[in-house]
Amino acid sequence: MTTIKTSNLGFPRIGLNREWKKTLEAYWKGNTDKETFLKELDGLFLSAVKTQLDQHIDIVPVSDFTHYDHVLDTAVSFNWIPKRFRSITDPVDTYFAIARGVKDAVSSEMTKWFNTNYHYIVPEYDESIEFRLTRNKQLDDYRRIKEEFGAETKPVIVGPYTFVTLAKGYEESEAKAIQKRLVPLYVQLLKELEAEGVKWVQIDEPALVTASSEDVRAAKELYESITKELSGLNVLLQTYFDSVDAYEELVSYPVQGIGLDFVHDKGRNLDQLKKHGFPKDKVLAAGVIDGRNIWKIDVEERLDAALDILSHADVEELWIQPSSSLLHVPVAKHPDEHLEKDLLNGLSYAKEKLAELGVLKEGLLSGKAAVSEQIEESKAALKALKAFATGANSAQKEELNQLTEKDFSRPASFEERLALQNESLGLPLLPTTTIGSFPQSAEVRSARQKWRKKDWTDEQYQAFINAETKRWVDIQEEIGLDVLVHGEFERTDMVEYFGEKLAGFAFTKYAWVQSYGSRCVRPPVIFGDVEFIEPMTVKDTVYAQSLTEKHMKGMLTGPVTILNWSFPRVDISRKEIAFQIGLALRKEVKALEDAGIQIIQVDEPALREGLPLKTQDWDEYLTWAAEAFRLTTSSVQNETQIHTHMCYSNFEDIVDTINDLDADVITIEHSRSHGGFLEYLKEHPYVKGLGLGVYDIHSPRVPATEEIYQIIDDALEVCPTDRFWVNPDCGLKTRQQEETVAALKNMVDAAKQARKKQAQLV
């Protein structure tokens, strides 16, 4: 008889009411002392674990909770401190300096955690690092929960293969040697856990799902070196986000358990299991509930899936768990949530997913009859959800069916458009602009709250937005920017704003998830067909344009980003959803152009993150992603300049797709790549308009004019001068006014210096 247990891989850190965010930001602002700060975070850690214990999860993780990022935790624990931060003596100050930067040292690079909306701090390797274990966080966390609750838990750590794969600063040929140098540190950490009596440790190796067979074999040697030093500690090797190609090699690792994702594996893990079986002496930790979406499960369907897995895995112990950490979904349904009943009842967040695991466990142990009530309840909830969504359906399918190839392409080539736009727009060499948003002060947030609480009328709120817009148009004029933006003060979030004005979206009040650091977002819920209702941005953009003789950019979020930053429905394909959004936005683009706006930016910062993890699956996604963008933008005249913006990406992977977007100008977050993309451009020139971000907007640090000038000068070594733009990395919403104005002044001054140099070269 197989023993069935429930397990979890990770839990949201932020708290039901974003207490984690508020605690961090109060400390960063100096409003909380260190002792109070650490005590408050400890309380949040305990609360997260207690929630899981209260849901009767058999195997609860610890050390997934962090003060900023779990990858950064691993780096700091192994003394991977970049040189520029080693003079800082306090460990907490060092930790946050790496994440956020300080006056004289830029922060470490931040990038997407695989193909999710979470960002991690990229570990930096250099030969001067003294490899040593500075802190055993896993042991500290295990002891803390044992002390507080008397509970046995499962410490979690990023594994050596994934950690080095995610790091930078070394040649590819050095990777295996660096991994081997980490082995003694893992052994030390794990032996300390073993001495404490820890029963299980979860070592996360998601990078193995994209690893070659050779690398999977090489990583096996790491685990042979690690586990041969252990005698009483059980190791669970955990993969997620996709299937493992070298399945037979992986399940032969010298560990006591293997975690596999049976949700996002496209059926491949299950096929491998059926073909090759699974070692009887190992625990199979099966991801059977989606850790990344927010929809209630069909209990019978998921129970059948778990039974199918069990029928092909002759194991003594099966753990059922989410497909990945629940970091990617909200904490729990909030008692004050305002959604329609049938929609709310069809949702399942982290806490609810743990309860669903309990139902599946009971069904596996006692049969379907034991959970018949829950089966019927889930079917009724999903039926009501479908009826609710169907009520919002539109005639958009007919519009999509009538699209032709002409609807996906501009009338003229880029070179022809460029000549017309240069004549029409009259911009200087190296034009300066920003990416869209400006700081949202406490006054802006307060005004929005007053309006939402009905303390202010629509007219009062619009008057405030207009005043703030005018103030920042004046500031931009004074700074000397060439192409202005209205500042987006009416928007809380670049996706939420559009979803609120399109049919087919629902918005929560409390369903927050972590994006990076203390930054939290509320992804929209796409429950029905997406449809344009009325112009969304025209009024505010036209007002801003009336305040200046300079060009004002229209600012939209692109269809792929809206899709990738939402919780999408699962009853139709992602491609179909993207095309629905693209068709709706196409009407907004046309409305802006008809209103006299000559530069329209359609942001796609999340285009790359939607890539499937396996390159064999890329072409299909990239093809329809580019098509959705062109569907949005191709209705405009040749004289209208289309911009797009991307951030946090390994752009080398998608340069062909960037070109296929056929945008006239693309602005790219660049400063945190520390010159990496420039190196790529030396070998692979980009011929359309390009703006490489010249300073990091995620840090309060104000870069000097000379520093920005040098970045521009370096870029012009490889980028065409007549189509290069100067801009910050991303929007400036989260920054303070003083630092924003100072940085932009320096940026404009640097651009002027660069123009002078270019004039001298002519």
UniProtKB/Swiss-Prot annotation:
Positions of the catalytic residues: 698
GO biological process: methionine biosynthetic process; methylation
Coiled coil: none
Protein name, UniProt field: 5-methyltetrahydropteroyltriglutamate--homocysteine methyltransferase
GO molecular function: 5-methyltetrahydropteroyltriglutamate-homocysteine S-methyltransferase activity; zinc ion binding
Cofactor or coenzyme needed: Zn(2+)
Organism phylogeny: Bacteria, Bacillati, Bacillota, Bacilli, Bacillales
Binding of Zn(2+), residues: 645, 647, 669, 730
Transmembrane segments: none
Domain of life: Bacteria
Pfam family name, one: Meth_synt_1
Binding note for cofactor: Binds 1 zinc ion per subunit.
Enzyme class: transferase
Binding site for 5-methyltetrahydropteroyltri-L-glutamate: 18-21, 112, 519-520, 565, 609
Role noted for this protein: Catalyzes the transfer of a methyl group from 5-methyltetrahydrofolate to homocysteine resulting in methionine formation.
Native source species: Bacillus velezensis (strain DSM 23117 / BGSC 10A6 / LMG 26770 / FZB42) (Bacillus amyloliquefaciens subsp. plantarum)
Key words of the record: Amino-acid biosynthesis, Metal-binding, Methionine biosynthesis, Methyltransferase, Repeat, Transferase, Zinc
Residues bound to L-methionine: 435-437, 488, 603
Ligand binding (L-homocysteine): 435-437, 488, 603
UniProt KW Zinc keyword: yes
Pathway linked to the protein: Amino-acid biosynthesis; L-methionine biosynthesis via de novo pathway; L-methionine from L-homocysteine (MetE route): step 1/1
